[in-house]
Amino acid sequence: MKSFVISIGCVLITALPIASAIGKDHSPEDQTFVNEASRGGIMEVKLGELAERNGLSSEVKEFGAHMVKDHTRLNKELGAAATSIGLTVPSDLSEDQKTEYTKLSKMSGKSFDKEYTDLMVKDHTKDLATFQKAESTTQDPKLKTAISSAIPVIQEHLSMAKSDESKLGAP
């Protein structure tokens, strides 16, 4: 019995370095990025669905549908990369995002279109900078691949949002 306990102890001690090595390529900054990017992606999907319902212009409705499709895919890709290296992926919005969503959910028509489009330009400008920074700082190849593949999509979304903003007469 004593040798059995010692054997189990040896197995556990041997397993500790292996368990702690999993996810070693990520940093606290990677977790911060995943938190921000995941919540941002969730917000894009929720707001895209809202744009399809509450938007007035066909541009806003189409842009919303595009956001739902693209960000659902990007969320899955980022989530898979993050969890594969031991990072936690949030599944809900931050309190600030919930407040922003509630505000927009009470709007419709032209006022919704303007507010939504302005927010999409602002958010995608910020997202692009965040993803570009993360791409240059992360050391994990899986996370870097997910980030790198998202950047052209975010650039496209920013361009589309600016075009819609211009068409709608927003600043």
Residue locations for each model-derived region?
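His/Met- and acidic-residue-enriched segments that coordinate or traffic transition-metal cofactors
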Residues: 2-9, 14-171
